[in-house]
A protein has these predicted regions:
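Cell-envelope/extracellular polymer assembly enzymes that use nucleotide-activated donors
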Residues: 3-6, 24, 34, 177
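Short, well-formed alpha-helical segments that are part of the catalytic scaffolds
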Residues: 13-27
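Short aromatic/hydrophobic "clamp" motif used to bind/position activated sugar donors
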Residues: 87
Length: 248
């Protein structure tokens, strides 16, 4: 449907945060959206919270996996369900600012872009120690190989592209791999430097050695880069990580 935004929220054991996350979508100044919430077989009361919230707004569509599939497959379920011209992803513990969708859709049209991401504020589970991550105005394939500047909860992309290039479930950094595929095909990705998302760091990416190993696998097996290029991009990734987490 033209101009409709399909907001995809995968949920797994997010009872402490999911209500606030959903309400941050419902507060949007741009109101022509559907919220597709897929519960990935949560063992807490996340699904009950989602069911209750869905009664208050017909734009909320809920779905429950019959077993735990993981975030990549769960997002792909949402992509298959989506009816909108655009898809926007939101993790179940992150929060949007109320002007996010409106500003991104305007910017996509202004720049004739396929993907739009934004700056974001990174907080811990106690919602303290906010750190601003400023998005570059534009990113291409080679730039993304050095550093993944597209935080998934900030992104809006054309649905047609995501249905063609969904998340690849064999890689741990599934969102990074998907953005790489899109940019490799020269789709245009632009960034809004205003912070429009609050990203909860939590325990994600806490194992830096594992993250480096997974990034190496992406370079070699997904992107099939040479040994020299893989080393070059891994060094850039590591240096950017040190700068991001220890000097900001």
């Amino acid at each position: 449907m033209k101009n409709l935004v399909s907001v995809i929220i995968p949920v797994y054991n997010a009872s402490k945060t999911i209500e606030k996350t959903i309400k941050s979508v419902l507060c949007q100044s741009y109101t022509y959206f559907e919220i597709i919430i897929i519960d990935d077989w949560s063992t807490d009361n996340s699904f009950k919270i989602i069911e209750e919230l869905s009664k208050s707004d017909s734009r909320i569509i809920i779905y429950r996996n019959q077993k735990n599939l993981g975030v990549a497959k769960t997002r792909n379920v949402g992509i298959n369900i989506a009816k909108g011209e655009f898809i926007s992803f939101l993790d179940s513990d992150d929060i949007w600012k109320c002007s996010k969708l409106e500003k991104q859709l305007e910017y996509i049209k202004q720049k004739n872009a396929d993907i739009c991401y934004t700056s974001y504020e990174m907080i811990n589970n106690n919602e303290t120690n906010s750190v601003l991550r400023v998005a570059p105005k534009e990113i291409n394939y080679n730039g993304l190989l050095k550093e993944n500047v597209i935080c998934c909860s900030t992104a809006v992309a054309k649905t047609s592209l995501l249905k063609k290039y969904p998340f690849q479930t064999e890689f741990f950094h599934e969102d990074f791999v998907m953005w790489l595929k899109l940019l490799k095909h020269e789709y245009k990705a632009v960034g809004i430097q205003e912070s429009l998302v609050i990203y909860r760091k939590g325990g994600r990416s806490s194992d830096k050695l594992k993250a480096c190993r997974n990034r190496w696998i992406v370079y070699r097996k997904s992107e099939k880069l040479s040994l020299i290029l893989s080393i070059y991009y891994l060094i850039n990734y590591t240096l950017n990580g040190v700068k991001k987490y220890y000097f900001c």
